[in-house]
Amino acid sequence: QHFNFNSIFHRHIKLFSKKFIHSFKGKKFKPMDLSTSKRVCTGITTNNKVEPKIGTHDGVFHCDEILACFILKKLPHYYNATIIRTRDETKLAECDVVVDVGGVYDPAIHRYDHHQRSFQETFSSLVPSKPWTTRLSSAGLVYVHFGRNVIAHLLNIESNDDLIDAVYDKVYENFIQEIDGIDNGIGICEGEQKYRITTHLSARIGNLNPSWNEPSNDALIQQRFERAMQLAGEEFQDKVFYYAHS
C-alpha cells in the first residue's frame, strides 16, 4: 500500500489549527488605551538576556529606588533579575531597565530617572484622567507604568479586572504619593508645621544606611539594601491586599 506522507502531514496540520483557534474562543483581551497624550506602558520587554538586570545608583539608597526595584522584581520577567548598583553609564547601558539614575526618563528604552532639571512629570501629566499632581520620584514612575501588572500578579486576577483600577488608584493616593513627595522635598502643607513625622517608610529606609561613623563595606551596604527592599516591599504588598479587600 502506497504511504502518502503529505496527506497525513496536512491532516495533522489542519487538526492542530482547529484546536489552536478553538482554544482562543471566548477569551477576552483588553485593548490598548491610546487615549492619553503620553505613552504609559503596562508591560515590559527584556533584551532576551538569560539574567535580566535592573540598574540603579550606588551609594546612599532611598525609599523611591528601593520600592521601584521591588515593584519591578514582582513582574514575572524580572523575578530573578540582578540589581546592578552603579553610576557607570557603560554598566547601566547593559541593564534592561534603569531607575533613579542616568538623567533620562524614556519608557521606550525603560529609563526611569527623575533628577534631570527638565523632569516635571506627575501622575496627572502622564495619565490625564488622574488627579494627582505631586512630582513623581522613581517609585511613582515605575508604579504608573507597571503598577497595574504587579497588582494583577499579586492578587492573581485577570489584567482587565475592575478591581485593579480601584486598588491602583488607592495605593498611589495613600502610599506611593507620599514617597514621591518626600523624595522630591515637597512639604505636606504650606506654612509652619506643628510637628514632624519621623517614622514614615522613607525615614525608616533611610535609617538602614550605615551611619557616618559605622564600619562599612560593599557587602554590608548590599545587605542593608536588600533589607530595605524587603521592608518597603512588605508595606507595598500590605497596601495592595488591604485595598483589595476593603
Task: Identify the function of each model-found stretch.
Residues H2-K25:
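N-terminal mitochondrial targeting presequence
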Residues I182-S246:
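Glycine-rich, Lys/Arg-enriched anion-binding loops that position phosphate/diphosphate groups
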